[in-house]
Amino acid sequence: MEKIANLDDIKKGGSLYFTYKGKKAILIRTKKDDIVAYIAVCPHEGGNIEWDGQLNIVLCECHLSLFNASDGSVYRHSTAFELNRGLTGIDVTVDKENNIFVK
């Protein structure tokens, strides 16, 4: 397991980017205090994704598709294409000292 951060490093509704197995990834702390991580690439055409802590969604910059922060599933996709795949999740654990690790 690889340590990414500590809970104190990320406020509720915040995020941070990190590298996971050579790929850009994002760690998100939702307003409900869930900790999730995803490969930071849209499954449609590989566009960058951004976290919107106000709306609690992940947004693809290319086609404005939206993904649920809690599980990476498609929330809404562009009408120009059908998107059936959600974001690629990364297993996250938090230890008793609030350190955040990915597998």
PLM feature spans:
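N-terminal pre-ligand scaffold of iron-sulfur
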Residues: M1-L55, N68-A69, S73, G86-K103
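Short cysteine/histidine-rich metal-coordination sites, predominantly Zn2+-binding motifs
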Residues: N56-L64, V74-L83
